[in-house]
UniProtKB/Swiss-Prot annotation:
Residues 109-136 form a coiled coil. Pfam families: bPH_1, YvbH_ext. PANTHER family: HYPOTHETICAL CYTOSOLIC PROTEIN, YVBH-LIKE OLIGOMERISATION REGION. Keywords: Coiled coil. The gene is yvbH. This is Uncharacterized protein YvbH. It comes from the Bacteria. InterPro entries: PHb, PHb_sf, YvbH_oligomer_dom.
């Protein structure tokens, strides 16, 4: 009930409104942020039906079936599992009341309308999402190259193995090295926390 009253106080409609940090506690999404894991809200768009909460770890979507219903479905999209791509910002024409940011998270398409007088803030989100998408794309290439390099190294060692080397011992050593190598690469390039990107573009 309190959240509904707060939504009315924020003057919400079907067109999204960017919520200021001091009002995050008036939203439903704030209840589902994993503060215990140092998760932090960086950007929040709210309509009467939906909330789109961008944290350093994930997009939290509080999905309302319709503005007149109190029923909500909580959807969480970790950036490490749902890659951001196809980020677009559509500006307003002379008679338009809203601007629109579009992007994909994994296989999900998001089209979010925001009041056009908040376009400057929306530009910051656009830049942050675009940078995350670029970083993820580049890192996927590096991870793939690392895996291919390991495969080539294993093949070369297999064909140049001296006769006196124990096959079982060599296989064990290669397996342990490969696991350590790939774990190290994944730790470096499979990013889960994009707080530094949001800090750069949202809070700067």
């Amino acid at each position: 009930m309190f959240k509904k009253i707060a939504a009315d106080a924020l003057g919400l409609s079907d067109i999204g409104k960017i919520i200021e940090p001091q009002d995050y506690d008036k939203t439903d999404a704030d209840d589902y942020v994993m503060h215990e894991d140092n998760e932090k809200i960086y950007f929040l768009i709210k309509t009467k039906a939906d909330e789109y909460c961008f944290t350093n770890l994930a997009l939290i979507h509080v999905d309302g079936e319709r503005a007149t219903s109190s029923k909500r479905t909580l959807k969480r999209y970790p950036y490490s599992q749902y890659k951001i791509s196809d980020v677009f910002l559509e500006t307003a024409g002379k008679v338009d009341l809203d601007v629109e940011i579009k992007f994909k998270l994994g296989g999900e398409q998001f089209d979010i309308d925001v009041h056009k007088d908040q376009i400057e803030k929306l530009k910051d989100l656009y830049k942050a999402l675009l940078r995350i998408a670029e970083t993820t794309y580049e890192n996927d290439i590096l991870i793939n190259q690392a895996e291919q390099s390991l495969d080539k190294a294993v093949t070369i060692l297999h064909h140049t193995r001296p006769e006196h080397v124990n096959i079982e011992t060599q296989y064990k050593e290669l397996t342990e090295f490969g696991f350590t190598w790939l774990t190290s690469v994944r730790s470096q390039y499979h990013i889960k926390d994009f707080g530094d990107v949001f800090e750069k573009y949202i809070n700067n």
